[in-house]
Structure formats: structure tokens, C-alpha cells
């Protein structure tokens, strides 16, 4: 049959179509040139440009009036829609499904958007992606699946990748399936360019997607956590670790009562402590920290390794150290009955716990005891057996003085407004094969809190000393809540029945929050209030610029006490050695402090993500054997898509709103999910049944019983 010649030809490019496209592009360039010529930024011009130039090159009046062009970062959802974050805009721009132009989570995109008033009178924004400026994600991890309508052909089938990350709603087609089976978990390189088709090239096959090993390896790869060191790095560490320990030129504290207290399984012992009571009731607290910078010279392989890794990472079954084990568990670790190089903060405290004076000295110690938290707690609460009492008999008088000082510091910190927002921590118990057989809530006693208080005191003293001496430092900072988040939190607290009239909605103090938490504890509502308080606050980070630490209520604070496992502490040690002790010019280390702060902040986020995901993996594996069981749980979070519920074993999971039965709506203002008959709130106790344990995504699904 003869085709109608008047119809468009989609099969090949015609000369006329080519001319039209060239004309359209020419008009676009001329318009941008004209706008730049009159001082308008073509990146922020408030009209449609490319897609809204019609066949005659005209732009509608509505577009010129209402629509804005801007560039931002795209965040996608599993449902296909997304949001774009713009600088200067309080709220993200909504991008409906079908208007993302193939953008993937993390891409930098050019969008056109408009603002409108919803039926409720709220001003909202909506837009569409017109161009992907740069690709944020280079690879994707997922499970290989096959359908006749998707992916690379093999025996009549086509293969595609179902991403582990639910935010990637487009399933990329595999360009090759050699050595790959359906059900394998792989990492693949994304092939971009076609906005309506996403492809990927296999890079690594981790194994069967339901296996623990495959998921573990995939998480490490996705978060960029490297397990092994190179031969050169190991050799350099071994060389420096072999250096003999000599007391010359250092404060010799080997005759003092100095010891460590740490977890039973810890091998990287950063810190040791000592305490003396002075005349007039004052205290001399010694916090002796492994002198790691001595073993990690500037510009060495190890120095670059520390900058790249940024932190040790603590998984359920292993520790991935920042430095090779010959240092982290060997030469630097303050093992008992071994001479060790340390950097000692000798701090004089008043009888009320106020810092009166602080000295920082290179030193040599010989720890007399390898203390364990559980054993020291047993001594404190009177349950220690004869074996424990015999082990600690030489230091029990010192421990009693230390506990007295800890209680003084605790009272001082509370009065200052330091916030205690402890979330439940899990202790996952593994059998000989590395399989979890039980999960319990980790308890913190006075021994853990004592060490924490002493380390906090040392960190504050060191930061203050460096600041007062105008010496660079890698500060630990925590900004106060932003006014909009603070206002939302105070509204929630007010609706819960708390008096918030004494707190400004523009700015609050740590004491304000501490007062609210105290009131919540009296009412038995500390969990929901703590959760919403955490949501209102920014995350702590590192900075070369001094800023307050809101959560601790301190004006000067740094991390000094864990240089084996944290770059921030190692950098601060190096600056102390080079500038404070050796007298080098402070400005020589200002840029180093900035680089270290940025690298440490990035590494911390990476490590926290990996630790959380590995922990969730083990929790899901453990709970796979308990599907169908019922648990008493606490509503730990409320969102538009359901309730998060946490049983006593901390294995948190979602009850989808669609499975609650009846017609429920999410009340964002009061953080509740309600129907006409029922209301679910943060902190409610509910009975749940485990319905699903998804090892691929590391998630649990419950239902209300």
C-alpha cells in the first residue's frame, strides 16, 4: 500500500526537518546572546527557552510571566517522580513522572518551573527537566532479571538490572550478559546520552543476590570502603612501627597510674587516663592519647592513606582500619605493659569541674591495666566477682575518684545544656560461621559515660588552647537549628502539650532544648520529643573555622582523642606537634586544617552509611528466620507512607499506610497517622507481625496485629 506522502517521516532525517532544527537552535543562541548582552543571566532567565520556543520561535505570555529557569541537583523516587534542590529556595521543586527527561538520582539538571497556589492556599512549585547538565551517578548496583520486553537479548530474552537503590526507577538494559545469570547481583557502568533509554555495562559480579556475601561486598563497593592496603602501605607501616620507644625528649609517665578502659573486643586502644587529687579539692586529669602523628610522617604514603580513608569503619563482623594493623592494633595501640608514645593533655579542673589550666605534652606511658567497660560497671554497681576485684585492686581507689569527677562533670554538662539524645544501639551476636543468632540492645553504663566525659573535657581543653594561641585546628562544630525547622519543632512540641513560650522561634539555646527534654522525661514522652528534636537539628561536622557546638553547648570543641581511627584527630595532633611544640608558623598549616576538615566530614558520612547498611543487612538476615512472629514495638517514626516500628531488639521496619486498613491520612504538623477511629503517634506501643525481610534492600515490613 502506498503511504500518504503528507505524513511525517520518523525513519530518517529530511532536509526540511534539519533546516528547522538548525533555525530553532540559531534562534535559541541569539536569544541567549541578547539576554547576556543586556545583563540578564541566561542561567536564571525567567522565561522558557528551548522547549517553549514554538514553530515560529515565539514564547507564550504565560511562560514569560510565570516560569523560571534554574539549575539544581535531582533527587528521584521509586515512583518515578522527583525533586530538584535549588540554592536559595527553601523548598525543593517537584518534578512529575514523565518530566524527568531520564534524570537519575544525583544528576545536576536544568529545569523550568513555576509556582502556583494549591486548593488549600499553600504556594507550591512544579517543573520539568529540560537538560541534564552533568551525571551524578556513574555506576549502579542491582539484580539481573529478564523479560521479553527489556534488556540485552539472549536466547530470545532481554536482560535488565533492577537497582538496589529504589530511587532509581528506570531499569537499565544490559549491553552484555557474558558470565552473568538471572539472579546475580552486579555492579554496572551506566551508559547515558539517550534521555528515554538507560543502558549499563557489567563491571563486577558479586554473586547470588540473596547471599550475605554478595550483599556485603556490594555495600562496600557502593560506599567506596576499601578493606585492604597496598603492599607499599603495609611495608611503610611496618617500617615505622618497628621504631624503638625511647623516653628522651618526652614527659616520662611510666611510673604513674595510667590505664585504659574500652570495649572487650577493642584492639585499637587510642586513649588512657590518669587522675590525681590536688590541694584545695582540685583535680589533675590526664588524658593520654596515642601519638599517631609520630608514626605517620607528613607527605608519606600513610599520610595520603589517612587523608583518603578519613576514618576507621566499624562493622558487625570486622573493623576496617584507617591505618594498617601494624600501627592501629600494634605500635599505636596503648596495650597494657608496653611502653607507648602518647600526646598527653594534662588538665587542671576545679572542684566544680571547670577547666582552670591545660598543658599538652609529648609523653611516654606504660598502661598498667587493660580495663573493660563491663567489668568497671560491675565494680561501680557492686556486682563484681572476686576475679574482677583481683584484676582491678591496684586501681580501685583511682576509679572511685574518677567516678566522683565524672558525676561532677555530668552535672556541669547538664547545667550547660549539653543534650543527651541517645538512640537505641544494637549488639549483633554472631556464631562461628558469621551468622547472627541474636540481637540485643546495647547498654551504656557509668564506665562508658565516664570515658566519654573525660574525652569531651580533653577535646574542649585542646580546642580552647589552640584557639587562644591562634593556631589552626580541625574543629568539631554543630550549628543551631535553622529558623524554619525550629519553628516546626516548637509547633509540634506545643501540640504535644509542652510549654514553649520561653523559646524564640528565631533562635534557641541548648538550655532551652535541655529544659524541654527534662519535661518530656517527666511525662514519659522523651522518645517522640527526642526524635523530632533530632530532625530539627543539623548534623555535626568538621571545620577549620571555629563555631559553637550546639549539641554540647560549647563554644570551642575539637576531636583530639582518637587519632588511630579519625583523620580529624590525627590532623589536630600534627598541628600541635608542628606549631605548638616545634614553633612552626601557624599559617603553614591553615590550608592543611581546611583540607583535613573537608576530608574528615566526607569520610564520616561515607562510613556512617556503610555501617548502617551492613548492620541492617545482618538484622534482615537474623529476622528472616522470624517471619510470621509477633513483637511488641514502639512507633519510632511517622511518615506519609507509613509507620516505622521498633521492637526491643532494635530491628526497625515499616508498616505501610496502605496496609493499616481503612482510610488513614498523614498529619505532618503533628506527626501522626489518623483515621476517624484511630490515631498513631510517635512513641505509641503497638503489636506487630513480621511479614517480609528483604535482604536486597536491607528492609523489614511489619503489619499491625
Question: What name fits each language-model region?
Answer:
Residues 2-286, 293-339, 370, 377-380, ...:
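Charge-lined substrate channels and their catalytic hotspots, especially those that engage the 3′ end
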Residues 2, 70, 177-178, 182, ...:
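Electropositive polyanion-binding surfaces
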Amino acid at each position: 500500500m502506498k503511504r500518504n506522502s503528507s505524513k511525517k517521516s520518523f525513519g530518517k532525517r529530511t532536509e526540511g526537518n534539519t533546516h528547522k532544527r538548525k533555525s530553532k537552535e540559531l534562534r535559541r543562541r541569539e536569544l541567549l546572546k541578547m539576554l547576556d548582552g543586556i545583563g540578564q543571566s541566561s542561567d536564571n532567565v525567567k522565561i522558557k527557552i528551548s522547549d517553549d520556543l514554538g514553530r515560529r520561535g515565539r514564547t507564550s505570555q504565560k511562560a514569560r510571566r510565570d516560569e523560571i529557569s534554574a539549575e539544581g541537583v535531582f533527587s528521584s523516587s521509586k515512583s518515578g517522580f522527583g525533586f530538584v534542590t535549588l540554592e536559595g529556595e527553601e523548598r525543593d521543586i517537584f518534578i512529575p513522572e514523565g518530566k524527568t527527561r531520564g534524570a537519575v538520582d544525583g544528576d545536576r539538571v536544568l529545569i523550568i518551573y513555576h509556582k502556583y497556589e494549591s486548593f488549600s492556599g499553600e504556594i507550591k512549585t512544579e517543573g520539568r527537566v529540560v537538560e541534564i547538565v552533568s551525571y551524578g551517578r556513574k555506576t549502579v548496583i542491582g539484580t539481573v532479571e529478564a523479560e521479553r520486553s527489556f534488556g540485552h537479548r539472549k536466547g530470545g530474552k532481554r536482560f535488565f538490572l533492577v537497582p538496589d537503590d529504589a530511587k532509581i526507577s528506570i531499569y537499565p538494559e544490559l549491553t552484555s550478559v557474558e558470565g552473568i545469570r538471572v539472579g546475580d547481583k552486579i555492579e554496572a557502568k551506566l551508559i547515558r546520552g539517550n534521555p528515554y533509554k538507560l543502558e549499563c555495562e557489567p563491571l563486577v559480579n558479586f554473586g547470588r543476590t540473596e547471599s550475605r556475601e554478595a550483599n556485603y561486598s556490594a555495600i562496600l563497593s557502593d560506599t567506596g570502603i576499601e578493606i585492604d592496603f597496598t603492599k607499599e602501605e603495609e611495608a611503610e607501616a611496618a617500617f615505622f612501627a618497628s621504631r624503638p620507644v625511647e623516653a628522651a625528649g618526652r614527659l616520662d609517665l611510666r611510673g604513674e597510674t595510667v590505664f585504659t578502659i574500652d570495649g572487650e573486643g577493642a584492639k585499637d586502644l587510642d586513649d588512657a587516663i590518669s587522675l590525681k587529687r590536688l590541694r584545695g579539692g582540685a583535680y589533675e586529669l590526664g588524658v593520654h592519647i596515642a601519638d599517631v602523628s609520630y608514626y605517620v610522617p607528613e607527605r608519606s604514603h600513610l599520610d595520603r592513606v589517612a587523608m583518603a580513608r578519613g576514618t576507621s569503619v566499624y562493622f558487625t563482623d570486622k573493623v576496617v582500619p584507617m591505618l594498617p594493623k601494624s600501627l592501629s592494633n600494634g605500635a599505636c595501640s596503648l596495650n597494657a605493659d608496653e611502653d607507648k608514645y602518647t600526646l598527653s593533655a594534662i588538665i587542671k579542673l576545679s572542684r566544680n569541674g571547670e577547666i582552670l589550666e591545660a598543658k599538652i605534652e609529648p609523653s611516654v606511658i606504660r598502661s598498667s591495666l587493660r580495663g573493660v567497660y563491663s567489668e568497671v560497671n560491675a565494680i561501680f554497681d557492686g556486682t563484681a566477682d572476686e576475679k574482677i576485684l583481683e584484676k582491678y585492686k591496684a586501681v580501685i581507689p583511682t576509679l572511685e575518684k574518677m567516678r566522683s569527677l565524672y558525676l561532677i562533670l555530668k552535672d556541669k554538662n547538664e547545667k550547660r545544656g549539653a543534650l543527651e539524645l541517645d538512640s537505641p544501639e544494637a549488639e549483633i551476636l554472631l556464631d562461628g560461621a558469621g551468622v547472627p543468632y541474636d540481637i540485643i540492645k546495647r547498654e551504656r553504663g557509668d564506665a562508658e559515660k565516664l570515658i566519654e566525659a573525660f574525652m569531651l573535657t580533653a577535646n574542649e581543653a585542646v580546642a580552647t588552647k589552640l584557639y587562644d594561641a591562634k593556631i589552626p585546628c580541625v574543629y568539631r562544630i554543630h550549628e543551631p537549628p535553622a529558623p524554619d525547622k525550629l519553628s516546626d519543632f516548637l509547633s509540634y512540641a506545643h501540640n504535644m502539650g509542652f510549654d514553649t513560650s520561653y523559646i524564640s522561634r528565631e533562635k534557641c539555646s541548648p538550655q532551652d532544648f535541655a529544659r524541654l527534654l527534662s519535661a518530656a522525661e517527666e511525662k514519659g514522652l522523651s522518645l517522640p520529643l527526642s526524635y523530632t528534636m533530632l530532625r530539627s537539628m543539623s548534623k555535626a561536622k568538621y571545620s577549620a573555622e571555629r563555631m559553637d557546638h550546639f549539641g554540647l553547648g560549647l563554644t570551642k570543641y575539637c576531636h583530639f582523642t582518637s587519632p588511630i581511627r579519625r583523620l580529624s584527630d590525627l590532623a589536630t595532633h600534627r598541628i600541635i606537634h608542628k606549631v605548638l611544640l616545634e614553633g612552626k608558623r601557624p599559617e603553614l598549616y591553615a590550608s592543611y586544617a581546611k583540607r583535613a576538615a573537608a576530608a574528615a566530614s566526607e569520610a564520616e558520612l561515607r562510613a556512617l552509611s556503610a555501617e548502617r547498611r551492613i548492620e541492617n543487612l545482618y538484622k534482615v538476615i537474623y529476622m528472616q528466620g522470624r517471619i510470621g512472629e509477633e513483637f511488641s514495638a514502639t512507633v519510632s517514626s511517622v511518615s506519609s507512607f507509613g509507620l516505622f516500628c521498633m521492637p526491643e531488639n532494635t530491628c526497625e521496619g515499616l508498616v505501610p499506610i496502605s496496609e493499616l486498613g481503612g482510610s488513614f491520612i498523614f498529619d505532618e504538623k503533628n506527626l501522626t497517622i489518623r483515621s476517624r477511629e484511630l490515631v498513631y503517634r510517635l512513641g505509641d506501643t503497638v503489636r506487630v507481625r513480621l511479614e517480609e525481610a528483604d535482604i536486597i534492600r536491607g528492609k523489614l515490613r511489619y503489619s499491625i496485629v
